[in-house]
Amino acid sequence: MRPVALLTDFGLSDHYVGVVHAVLEKYAPGVPRIDLDHLVPPGDIWEASFQLRCAWPHLPAGCVVMAVVDPGVGTDRRALALALGRRFLVAPDNGLAASLGPASDVVEIDWRSMGLAEPSRTFQGRDLFAPAAAWLARGEDLTQMGKEVDSDILVSCPLPDPEPLTSGYQATVISVDRFGNLATNLPGSSVDDQAKAAWTSDEVARRVRTYSEAEGDEVVLLEGSAGFLELAVNGGSAAMATGLRRGDSVRITHTDDGGG
């Protein structure tokens, strides 16, 4: 049986996550389950998209990901099931479904086609997405879950792309983790090992390979575990040190231009 990985904004203080696990067990008894993240800020599609991108390459082949951060629940937004390479995704069509790139197959999930009761207007993670994830985990045919959808018309991912500059890139802070590290949208492979990052006219961070290379409370630039460049302070918070927040710009330049 295919494993199911869960990414939601349901939190851990209510019954929501437990009930989703119960529904998965009901429709796919014994299904292996992976809790990726249930602490996405409520309705934060941007953060959910980033966390999904970070986790995706490390999931086992055949894995079914149920990603539900769904501020449009109960509206006419589509519920989707997608095949992406050797993995599957069930998610609302609000940018999450498009966050991983083109899919080979996309269907709009139809509860009637799956023999389900009409889903709740407020908890479709339980009534629609969890049964859909279980359907795929059992090895059932994705194309029998509903009507096919052209992947070109999906709601686009909210994460911005880096803006090329003559000597580097204008990057954007796209996530701040619990350590205060500031992840940008620029892959580490986009610039050389001597690159620098500037966020004001007189504040510049040099690139290093490890946190321990930072001197004291120095803000440094390094490639994070997901492959994106981030600003960090060894043993401290880059968010506090710089005052930067998600959505702010950082200029990341090649060796011949340190910014400023």
What spans do the regions from the language model cover?
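A conserved acidic, glycine/proline-rich C-terminal tail/linker
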Residues: 183-243
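Surface-exposed interaction regions enriched in Ser/Thr/Asp/Glu
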Residues: 246-255
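Structural motif
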Residues: 3-5, 31-34, 63-66, 79-81, ...
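Anionic-ligand-binding alpha/beta catalytic cores of soluble enzymes and soluble regulatory domains
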Residues: 116-185, 190
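N-terminal glycine-rich anion-binding loop in soluble enzyme alpha/beta folds
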Residues: 2-40
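Fold-independent oxyanion-binding glycine-rich loops
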Residues: 8-10, 36-38, 68-71, 84-85, ...
